[in-house]
């Protein structure tokens, strides 16, 4: 890889994608505010700003840790300068929403630490002993479901808990609406995470990482994702009194678009994948518009 290509790769991965990933969290959070706040109460922008800023900062730190060691020092100051405005946004959001809202949002990413720790006891019939394994190994190919649940708890539940504290009549908040938005978020983030696993199948096979794609193959995985997304969206929509036709169309269109991208565009295609990431959880917002609260 030439130096200009390497530079573009770092800029895309360390700066562009974190912002896009941060924006990806907004549709579920906006949907959560829609089903939670009273009709005569204005939408609460600071919690959305705080969620966006924290998501960007977490992703920037994650991408910085993945940089080659020989280039990390060179790019460190640039990364710090880039992250500074988002630190300011996070401080602004915390000042308006309170420390408890910040801790609720940060508590979910900490589950990723638990995810990588050997905490699950497993008994071996062969040796007659009990050992502990990491949760991500215990979940096997369905570990992306754990990640999707974490995203749902961060983007929806943590936001809803804060919003209920700002309401004049929190007892009027729709628990059913909150649950539906949470389930939509888990459904579509599971689709997105699994599509990314299909894209990265060769890299995961080389690193002995178990995913749906490495365990069952690309075609069966895509078929399973299409069916599970359609059934998940349809079930949630019917429970909320929404349109079954719109549900099927929505799930089919987004599954088809993401599947085509995974099959035809490599991970190095930053802009197509960045655009797809931006729309990854848009179905959550679209679904919440058609559901009754």
UniProtKB/Swiss-Prot annotation:
Q: What is the effect of changing residue 137 to A?
A: Does not affect the catalytic activity
Question: At which residues is glycosylation annotated?
Answer: 172, 208
Q: How does it sit in the membrane?
A: Multi-pass membrane protein
What EC designation does it have? 2.5.1.-
Q: Which cofactor does it need?
A: Mg(2+)
Q: Which GO terms describe its cellular component?
A: membrane
Changing residue 151 to A: what effect? Answer: Largely decreases the catalytic activity
Looking at the UniProt entry, the stretches that span the membrane are: 10-30, 45-65, 75-95, 105-125, 142-162, 243-263, 269-289
Its recorded reaction(s) are: (S,S)-drim-8-en-11-yl diphosphate + D-mannitol = sporulositol A + diphosphate
Disulfide pattern: none
Which biological pathway? Answer: Secondary metabolite biosynthesis; terpenoid biosynthesis
Consequence recorded when altering residue 189 to A: Largely decreases the catalytic activity
Subcellular location per UniProt equals:
Membrane
Its keywords, alphabetically, are: Glycoprotein, Membrane, Transferase, Transmembrane, Transmembrane helix
| Family the UniProt entry places it in | Belongs to the UbiA prenyltransferase family.
Functional description taken from the UniProt entry = Prenyltransferase that exclusively uses vviB-synthesized drim-8-ene diphosphate (cyclo-farnesyl diphosphate) as the native prenyl donor to catalyze the prenylation of D-mannitol on C-3'-OH to produce sporulositol A. Moreover, when the native substrate D-mannitol is replaced by other C6 saccharide polyols (D-sorbitol or D-galactitol), vviA is able to transfer drim-8-ene diphosphate to each C6 saccharide polyols with low yields, showing a broad substrate tolerance toward C6 saccharide polyols.
What name goes with this protein? Answer: Prenyltransferase vviA
Q: Which organism is it from?
A: Viridothelium virens (Speckled blister lichen)
Gene symbol here is vviA
């Amino acid at each position: 890889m030439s130096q200009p290509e390497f530079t573009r790769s770092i800029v895309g991965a360390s700066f562009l994608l974190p912002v896009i990933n941060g924006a990806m969290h907004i549709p579920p959070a906006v949907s959560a505010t829609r089903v939670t706040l009273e009709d005569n109460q204005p939408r609460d922008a600071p919690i959305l700003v705080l969620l966006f800023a924290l998501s960007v900062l977490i992703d920037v730190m994650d991408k910085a840790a993945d940089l080659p060691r020989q280039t990390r020092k060179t790019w460190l100051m640039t990364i710090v300068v880039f992250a500074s405005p988002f630190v300011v946004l996070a401080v602004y959001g915390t000042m308006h929403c309170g420390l408890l809202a910040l801790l609720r949002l940060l508590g979910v990413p900490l589950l990723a630490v638990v995810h990588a720790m050997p905490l699950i006891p497993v008994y071996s019939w062969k040796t007659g002993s009990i050992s502990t394994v990491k949760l991500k190994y215990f979940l096997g190919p369905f570990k992306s479901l754990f990640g999707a649940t974490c995203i749902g708890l961060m983007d929806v539940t943590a936001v809803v808990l804060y919003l209920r504290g700002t309401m004049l009549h929190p007892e009027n908040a729709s628990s059913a609406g909150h649950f539906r938005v949470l389930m939509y978020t888990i459904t579509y983030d599971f689709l997105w995470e699994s599509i990314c696993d299909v894209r990265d199948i060769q890299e995961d096979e080389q690193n002995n990482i178990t995913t749906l794609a490495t365990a069952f193959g690309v075609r069966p995985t895509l078929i399973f994702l299409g069916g599970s997304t359609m059934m998940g969206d349809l079930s949630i929509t019917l429970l909320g009194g929404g349109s079954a036709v719109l549900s099927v169309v929505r799930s089919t269109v987004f599954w088809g678009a993401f599947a085509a991208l995974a099959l035809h565009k490599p991970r190095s295609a930053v802009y197509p994948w960045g655009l797809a990431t931006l729309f990854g959880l848009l179905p959550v917002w679209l679904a919440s518009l058609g559901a009754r609260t």
